[in-house]
């Protein structure tokens, strides 16, 4: 079981070759850093991971200690890989881990419930917050101080000021 202080760093996609290597989708800013914070866990087992090569902005080929065949690495397919939050670098004041934001309540400046953060996306220029609104619509809003002036991690709530294009009436 994964504890509440664990942060998701990656997911094993598939075996790579016949020597026990695997493709891993990473959620770290630099994909090669998935192995930089110590052993990873799926909640049951610990894995010492070495990055063999970086495949792109969010994927690596990795070696898990103790795996030497495709058959062994196949068993890791779909495993979610976590690390203790205390192993990660301290964040700056306006930085957040993605898993902290997902599921947070979003309220308007007057306190009216607006929705819940359902996803964080990035299409190149900035992070986009996907909000599932209280009316059932899905709205995408740029993650900036002007649209999210308050992010309260402890209370699990954000204040959202929807851009004029979206408008409050689109709730």
Curated annotation (Swiss-Prot):
Task: Tell me the protein's name.
Answer: Ribosome maturation factor RimM
Please describe the quaternary structure of this protein: Binds ribosomal protein uS19.
Q: Which GO terms describe its molecular function?
A: ribosome binding
Q: Where is the PRC barrel domain?
A: 93-167
Q: Does the keyword Kinase apply?
A: no
Question: What is stated about domains?
Answer: The PRC barrel domain binds ribosomal protein uS19.
Which superkingdom, per the lineage? Bacteria
For biological process, the GO terms are: ribosomal small subunit biogenesis; rRNA processing
**One Pfam family, short name please?**
RimM
Summarizing the function annotation, the protein's role is: An accessory protein needed during the final step in the assembly of 30S ribosomal subunit, possibly for assembly of the head region. Essential for efficient processing of 16S rRNA. May be needed both before and after RbfA during the maturation of 16S rRNA. It has affinity for free ribosomal 30S subunits but not for 70S ribosomes.
Give the subcellular location.
Cytoplasm
């Amino acid at each position: 079981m994964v504890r509440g202080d664990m942060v998701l760093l990656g997911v094993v996609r598939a075996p790579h070759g016949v020597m026990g290597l695997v493709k891993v989708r990473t959620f770290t800013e630099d994909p090669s850093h998935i192995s930089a914070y110590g052993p990873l866990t799926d909640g049951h087992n610990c894995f010492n991971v070495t990055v063999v090569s970086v495949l792109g902005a969010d994927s690596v080929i990795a070696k898990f200690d103790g795996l030497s065949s495709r058959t062994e690495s196949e068993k890791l397919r779909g495993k979610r890989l976590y690390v203790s939050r205390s192993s990660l670098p301290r964040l700056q004041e306006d930085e957040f881990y993605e898993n902290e934001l997902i599921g947070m309540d979003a309220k308007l400046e007057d306190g009216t419930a607006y929705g819940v953060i359902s996803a964080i996306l990035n299409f190149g220029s900035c992070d986009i917050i996907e909000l599932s609104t209280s009316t059932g619509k899905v709205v995408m809003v740029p993650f900036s101080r002007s649209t999210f002036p308050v992010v309260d991690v402890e209370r699990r709530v954000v204040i959202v000021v929807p851009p004029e294009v979206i408008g409050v009436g689109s709730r």
